[in-house]
Regions:
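Exposed, interaction-prone extracellular/peripheral surfaces
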Residues: 2-51, 59, 64-69, 78, ...
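N-terminal juxtadomain amphipathic helix
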Residues: 71-73
Length: 315
């Protein structure tokens, strides 16, 4: 097991995910505020509802409808059986499960600016973990790669954060990657939506090269009972390249990408732009949060900035 280290952020090599580096992020995450929404039956619920549910809620009982009750909480079965309008009453959980879904596909092991995408993804995941611990929530993980996955059950406090960090260190190493393309994201989403507790906050960290036609259905169903944020990890070279000849490989085959002509650069940039826009449009269509992390960005700064927007945004 790994233990706590100094809060002074160590300098990593940008290639390997370091436990010391992820642990040190804790000192910078104390001000991060994960999205929260009071349950509809709460007396503290305001007039402007955030898009996020916040902590999960458990069904407590049904009672006679009272003026001012939220119609979305009507218990139609009891209403039909008794002939009198009834509404559901919920009890808020003390701890909200926060699940980091992390893509460890081969396409993550790429980077031309400061760090690999895999390292940036690991740092973002750790920052989310520390923010959850700070709020008193439980943090867990679901990591996936071609043909394999690992689940880390949500746990509270330092124990939960350290279990997540241990998983990140184990999974996000260049020598562990498999060859070939990315794992279909829909495969991971299907597994997650069958295991995540209602009311959870699910943060999906990926480059979204594994996006496929089935993601729409699984994301839609996941969003019914959980709050979802997508985080796309990017490298500048994936959507824009200067003129030149670039040897590239997917681990199995190699070729040369020639961007010496304007037409070829335009095609490359057009493909890169589609890759930027398609996952963002999908997540926004389902009213999910969205943020983008470049390999030369500071993950804690990006998370803090985007969370301030997400927390204050009404439905």
């Amino acid at each position: 097991m790994i233990g706590l280290a100094s809060s002074r952020p160590p300098e990593g090599d940008g290639i390997h995910v370091s436990a010391e580096e992820l642990i040190a992020l804790r000192a910078r995450c104390h001000a991060l505020r994960l999205p929260m929404r009071q349950p509809a039956a709460s007396a503290l619920a305001g007039a402007n509802r955030s898009r996020f549910r916040g902590r999960g809620v458990d069904f407590l009982e049904s009672r006679n409808y009272q003026p001012g009750d939220d119609i979305r909480n009507m218990d139609w079965r009891v209403t039909a059986r008794t002939g009198k309008p009834h509404t559901k009453v919920f009890q808020e959980e003390r701890e909200r499960p926060v699940l980091v879904v992390l893509d460890a596909s081969p396409t993550l092991y790429f980077g031309t600016r400061k760090r690999l995408k895999s390292v940036a993804a690991g740092q973002m995941a750790a920052a989310v973990g520390w923010a959850a611990v700070r709020r008193g929530d439980r943090i867990g993980g679901f990591m996936f790669a071609p043909g394999q996955h690992r689940e880390i059950r949500p746990a509270g406090g330092r124990r939960g954060a350290m279990r997540l960090i241990q998983g990140l260190v184990d999974w996000l190493q260049p020598d562990r990657q498999t060859s070939g393309g990315p794992e279909p994201l829909s495969t991971a989403l299907e597994r997650v939506r069958h295991t995540v507790r209602p009311g959870s906050l699910v943060i999906i960290i990926s480059d979204f090269f594994g996006l496929d036609e089935h993601c729409h259905r699984h994301l839609s169903r996941l969003r019914l009972h959980s709050d979802v944020i997508g985080c796309q990890v990017l490298d500048a070279a994936e959507h824009s390249l200067p003129a030149g000849r670039y040897p590239i490989t997917d681990g199995d085959q190699a070729t040369v990408l020639d961007t010496g002509h304007g037409a070829s650069r335009n095609r490359y940039e057009s493909m890169g732009q589609r890759h930027l826009e398609e996952p963002r449009r999908l997540f926004q269509k389902h009213d999910c949060g969205w943020l983008a992390l470049n390999t030369d960005d500071d993950p804690v700064d990006v998370l803090g900035r985007e969370l301030r927007v997400l927390v204050g945004r009404p439905v």
